[in-house]
Amino acid sequence: MASNKYKSLNEKWDLYIPFIELGLQLLCTNGTFSMIVPYPLTNQKYGKKLRKIITEEYCLLEITDLNGTKVFENATVSNCIPFVQNCLPKEELRITHFFEGKTIQEVLRKSPETLKQDEKDYIWNLTREERTGTRFANMNVLGDFCYISKGMVLNANENVEKGAFKKEDLISDVYDKIHSRKYIEAKDIDKYQVKRVRYLEWNTERCPDKLSRPTFRELYDCSKLILNCLGTINVTIDKEEYFLHNHSIYCAVLWKDLKDINNKSISSSIKKFCRYNRIEMETLSGKVDLYYLLAILNSSIADELLADQRGGDYHIYPEHIRNLPIPLPEKEVQKNIGNIAKEILQRRKVNADYSDLQEELDKMVASLYQ
């Protein structure tokens, strides 16, 4: 892979990327290549170069969209099937779906130009919806206000004590001196709600210091938003409990609340993903209210903005969350929206209906994006 044989390798590329490029390289003139591959080929950064190669240097005949269709029993990632011919690009390509009765049928046609969602990320849009990753380009994004991180990976560090313990060995349903911190996973949360709490072994010889991915302790000792990484975005707030969580949950911590905490994770994130320096982001984060951000991320427009970022993918990746555009209205507007979020939180505690509040909130948030 160190040679220049593969032009498609980009960032943390997946193994199927060079296999696709190799298949294309081996084609004779007018030969055709197809492969069942992960759906993230259509929308992830690591696939950008390959998407560009396929649409500009070859003829993309068809893409079978298998998003949501279980092809491989034990796989968690959805799939797609590109059909690529070694000839000049044509004016149209077919988008096909898998239907009951195990038939694949055409649902729409697109030009290579309309397939492309935007120039920046070269995401393929396999739907009829108009999507663009450049909407509200003049707004701040969530990453300007918050440090975004996955949680811990709770098995033993592969380089230190591989196989010495697994996640289940560290979790208890009841509190004791060893399992001393409240712990949640993505399946334990919903919009504005934590549904279940368990307890994690903490400050022992093996946890967190011998974890595969321990993150850093201070991440869990401050106020934050917590959200899932699959499907519809569900966000709640952690202002008092300071839950520990695993990698199925992302957290968003205001930059100002990490002031004076310096480590490789933070510095690397700033270098790779941020357009402002740390001092500027700490200042910016002082201008937003965490309850306001909670309301924004749980609003109906957030679903639309997330679709702009991830295309049709079922997964939510940190870069999707980090790049969500966020309006910055006056403090009084933020307070009013945040107060509705607080009221919804109270209703969720007693499982009361909050649809009227959500409707009101959606209207208020939508007005900020007009």
Regions found by a protein language model. Give the residues of each.
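Signature of N6-adenine DNA methyltransferases within the class I
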Residues: 1-167, 247-249, 261-263, 270-278, ...
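Short, flexible loop segments at the rims of nucleotide/cofactor-binding pockets, characterized by
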Residues: 11-12, 204-205, 347
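Polybasic, glycine- and aromatic-enriched phosphate-binding surface used to engage nucleic acids
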Residues: 17, 24-27, 130-332
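Short, well-ordered loop/turn and helix-capping segments at boundaries between secondary-structure elements
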Residues: 29, 42-43, 56, 60, ...
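Loop/helix-junction capping segments adjacent to catalytic residues or to phosphate/diphosphate-binding pockets
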Residues: 43-45, 287, 334
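Amphipathic alpha-helical segments
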Residues: 325-349
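Short amphipathic alpha-helical coiled-coil/interface segments
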Residues: 341, 354-369
